[in-house]
Amino acid sequence: MASSPGLDPHPLPMLQLQEVGSSKVSERPRSPGLLPAVYSPPLGMDSHTVCIPSPYTDSSHEYNHSHGPLTFYSPSVLSYSRPPITNSPSSLCPSLSPSAFWPSHNHPTMPSLTLHCPESIVYNEPSPHAPWLESKAHSINASSSSIIGCNKSLVKRSEEGVEDMNSSLCSSAVGKADMHFCAVCHDYASGYHYGVWSCEGCKAFFKRSIQGHNDYICPATNQCTIDKNRRKSCQACRLRKCYEVGMMKCGVRRERCSYRGARHRRGGLQPRDPTGRGLVRVGLGSRAQRHLHLEAPLTPLAPILQAKHVHLSAMSPEEFISRIMDAEPPEIYLMEDLKKPFTEASMMMSLTNLADKELVFMISWAKKIPGFVELSLADQINLLKCCWLEILMLGLMWRSVDHPGKLIFSPDFKLNREEGQCVEGIMEIFDMLLAGTSRFRELKLQREEYVCLKAMILLNSNLCTSSPQTAEELESRNKLLRLLDSVIDALVWAISKMGLTTQQQTLRLGHLTMLLSHIRHVSNKGMDHLSTMKRKNVVLVYDLLLEMLDANTSSGGSQPSSSPSSETYSDQHQYPQPPSHLHPGSEQTTADHAIVPPLGPTDDPILDGHLDAMPLQSSPPFQSLVVPHMDTNDYIHPEQWSLGTGDAAPSVEPTDYITTERVVMETALVTQP
């Protein structure tokens, strides 16, 4: 390559680039606001050429200048953005044509030249790294008609000529695949904090809440919207949502996993899997560390779930009990100013508000039970809806074990038996709760046994209600059975550690499991009573509690039936009363009692005859007088059902256990105005 005149004949090889259609560079005027001259030729060189030292060219290629200089110089090509000059002559700013990118066809044999072009530099923007560290090789071939560019953001200009070229930014911004959003407020997450992806604000809020006092009170209905703009409006709902999405105190990450760390590790320090995707090691609150794909779909997570299932199967009973004990929710406070003496409305409102708070923590507790989240979503929902009141009552009994004669609903809400007299129909439920608590006190129930019974109630609540129909349902049912076996093994292990004989261990296991049927019976009573209070508008039920209550009442087992119960006919047959005993003022009273059936067992011996005379298989459900009563456990006085029927009287057919005279009397009762 020939050197320029006046220079050493053996300097570094130079590449001559000549401007197209322009005058001498020294004659160009500078417009105000423009950058200074991009490149000034050194002294002794022709001003028509621009020389580039050889380190910017491929040293392995020998360029022959006999074909003429390469017309490649242009501020736009070198990614220098400048504003258009409208008042300058057109000769000063020539339009960029395709000929500026490759030579004419007069040189078909020109060899290819490889240039190392760095990424385009945008002025007034900080460069994340030196451009020469990530240089890319681009080939310029004279025989091809492809457009040459230094990066993908370089756009071809049209042949008619456009004043300036738009160049996109080439900064190393984070891609969409690396973005995570806060599970609480849906803002951009800064990392994996307390078991979930969360932003710095929600992380700091949750940290303050678990370290200090979290006695937040929602001014509305505990259903405030928590998003990026309204996350500071209600601290109570924000903390509730933190627990709902799975934030937990033990879920501290073992290694920082933020965008910056993931991006830096992607450069070579980050481990990679065989598919080429980067892996990030995240601590999930357990001793075993797991690998999570940042960009992988859901299907590659199957080995992780399989390993998790194996880990559950190999878990010892001691470790299983430790896990479910750690999952126990904290103490929940009512945080209300209790005004005594209670009224029916105030006590029911306090009970429902506390139950609504406990339901939120119950869902989080269930998800922390090992293996529960592996069940199908339908099974998880059904299990919770079938046993929510049983779990609440078991927790109430456990808190009340050390307080004879009292029910400890929360540390700031304790009731004696006599205080329940203000609520109609709740005294029997209180007595049953106190009886169960007394039985736990006699057995000296241990905390390990309590958590096992609580998990057993959850997993056994909906086991025999339906049969699996699909392969997914069958698989979920098998997982549920294996999980229930783990709970039973844990309970047996907990009893064996008490130093009892084999016979005593067997008896204790039987006594504890028999109490579960008592808890379910109390739960059914409480469900009926709460439904009654809701129908009478004594208390307003809303939010999660309303959904749980509707799920139980709509199942057909807890709705009171309008048909007369078996005790009605038995009482009438044993104690006949003339219709004249009804006085005009008793209509309203009896109607009210029809809405709230008096609770209490009956000693009527005719009930056995009714069950024998009307088997379930021989009568349709709508004609049976026993099945609705057995479903609802309602006890209706014989004088009440006829006045509460309203428009139509129930149809009564003569049977072998009801005399004709009694049917005539009942007809008179119904038709009496």
Swiss-Prot record:
Main location per the UniProt record: nucleus
Protein name: Estrogen receptor beta
DNA-binding region residue numbers: 182-247
Sequence segments annotated as region (Modulating): 1-181
Superkingdom of the source species: Eukaryota
Any single GO CC term annotated in Swiss-Prot or TrEMBL for this entry: nucleus
Subcellular location: Nucleus
Function according to Swiss-Prot or TrEMBL: Binds estrogens with an affinity similar to that of ER-alpha, and activates expression of reporter genes containing estrogen response elements (ERE) in an estrogen-dependent manner.
Tissue: Abundant in the liver and testes, less abundant in the ovary and barely detectable in the muscle.
Stretches with biased composition (Low complexity): 554-566
Pfam families membership: ERbeta_N (PF12497), Hormone_recep (PF00104), zf-C4 (PF00105)
Domain notes: Composed of three domains: a modulating N-terminal domain, a DNA-binding domain and a C-terminal ligand-binding domain.
BP-aspect Gene Ontology terms: cellular response to estradiol stimulus; estrogen receptor signaling pathway
One of the record's GO molecular function terms: sequence-specific DNA binding
NR LBD domain: residues covered: 316-552
Annotated keywords: DNA-binding, Lipid-binding, Metal-binding, Nucleus, Receptor, Steroid-binding, Transcription, Transcription regulation, Zinc, Zinc-finger
Annotated family: Belongs to the nuclear hormone receptor family. NR3 subfamily.
Region (Disordered) location: 553-602
Complex formation: Binds DNA as a homodimer. Can form a heterodimer with ER-alpha.
Annotated signal peptide: none
Positions of NR C4-type zinc fingers: 182-202, 218-242
